[in-house]
């Protein structure tokens, strides 16, 4: 019950202002979404085997079949020789390489077999010859420069050693010869004059 003259305070409902809305939304915006972890690319294995065409050529020359060698025979030879170096899917890559080489004229396709063409034989020989030449030149050059440098050092050292002791010996000999010659002359001149003076006085 309320007293007379007292009025009940009606409950005031506050409407949310724009400032309060911003405050409510602010903490939500502060939270940064977690960036997805970037997947590190798997490091590709270093290729240790020689180029496919070179391996194909080696297989065809080793098999030496007149009608050409089949892809299976080439793959078997490559697997026996480069087993640890070849990838798991090397047979698929070999099939593509055989087709591409035949299209370029490096290989001759006879039914289901492949044979080396003259162009394919020449290409590999020129590549190997050009690769070997720069290595030989690079090895020879530093040896010649080292030999000239050592020869120049050897020639310089004896010249300096011979030049220094010569003037000392010559100077010492000249001084020794000149001093006794001057000392002997006055003694020989004075001795006969003194004897003559004594004789005249007597």
From Swiss-Prot:
- Keyword DNA-binding listed: yes
Lineage: superkingdom: Eukaryota
Domain H15 intervals = 48-118
Q: A single Pfam family, by name?
A: Linker_histone
Q: Which CDD domains match?
A: H15
Q: What induces it?
A: By abscisic acid (ABA) and drought stress.
Q: Where do the segments described as Disordered lie?
A: 1-50, 114-202
A GO BP term, please? negative regulation of DNA recombination
Q: Where in the cell is it found?
A: Nucleus; Chromosome
Q: Name one GO cellular component term.
A: nucleus
Keywords from UniProt, A to Z, are:
Chromosome, DNA-binding, Nucleus, Stress response
Query: Residue ranges under compositional bias (Basic and acidic residues)?
Result: 18-38
The UniProt entry, under PROSITE patterns, shows: H15
Q: Which GO terms describe its molecular function?
A: double-stranded DNA binding; nucleosomal DNA binding; structural constituent of chromatin
Biased-composition ranges, Basic residues, are 160-202
Q: Which family does it belong to?
A: Belongs to the histone H1/H5 family.
Q: What is this protein called?
A: Histone H1
Q: What is the lineage of its organism?
A: Eukaryota, Viridiplantae, Streptophyta, Embryophyta, Tracheophyta
């Amino acid at each position: 019950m309320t007293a007379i003259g007292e009025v009940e305070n009606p409950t005031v409902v506050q409407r949310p202002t724009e400032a309060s809305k911003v405050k409510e939304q602010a903490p939500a915006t502060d939270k940064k979404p977690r960036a997805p972890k970037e997947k590190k690319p798997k490091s590709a294995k270093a290729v240790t085997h020689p180029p496919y065409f070179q391996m194909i050529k080696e297989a065809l020359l080793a098999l030496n079949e007149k009608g050409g060698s089949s892809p299976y025979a080439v793959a078997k030879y490559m697997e026996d020789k480069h087993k640890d170096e070849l990838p798991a899917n090397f047979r698929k890559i070999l099939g593509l390489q055989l087709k591409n080489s035949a299209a370029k004229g490096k290989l001759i396709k006879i039914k289901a077999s492949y044979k080396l063409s003259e162009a394919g034989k020449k290409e590999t020989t020129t590549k190997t010859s050009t690769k070997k030449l720069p290595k030989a030149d690079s090895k020879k050059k530093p040896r010649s420069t080292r030999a000239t440098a050592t020869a120049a050092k050897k020639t310089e050292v004896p010249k300096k050693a011979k030049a220094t002791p010569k003037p000392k010996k010559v100077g010492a000999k000249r001084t020794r010869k000149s001093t006794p010659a001057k000392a002997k002359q006055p003694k020989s001149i004075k001795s006969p004059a003194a004897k003559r003076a004594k004789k005249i006085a007597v």
